[in-house]
Amino acid sequence: NLDFIIVDMPPGTGDTQLTFAQEIKIDGAIIVSTPQELALQDVKRGIKMFDKLGVKIIGLIDNMSHFVGDDGKKYSIFGEGGVRKTAKEFNKEFLGEIPINPEIGKQGDLGSPIVESQPDHEISKIYLNFAEKIKSIYL
């Protein structure tokens, strides 16, 4: 049985997203964005498009929200709070943040998702938390 299928689409509201939403019954969309203003403009158009098409928006995720330097300080190099603010503006749930962490790319390059190879890693816990939130909506 297939409970969920997640489709990673290119940014924006172009033909890919529109055709997908019109041709396939979608139970919900999760919008993932970096916190830059230009990216958030696409997010706002995407929210309006999905709302118009009757596709439920499960929530928004802030990707590459920050990184923690060797000094232990948090650096928000792409801006801070934009995705959360956009979620609030459109009355959508803010699901959380994914910080920049080189381990994500490293494990991906090795063909081993971080949630499998390092289930106790902070990033794994973030991903699993998203999965639980999404699951709780549908199950």
Language-model-detected regions and their locations in the chain:
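C-terminal boundary of histidine-terminating zinc-finger modules
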Residues: 110-123
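Conserved catalytic-core segment of NTP-binding enzymes
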Residues: 3-107
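Short, intrinsically disordered/low-complexity patches at protein termini
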Residues: 39, 55, 119-120, 139
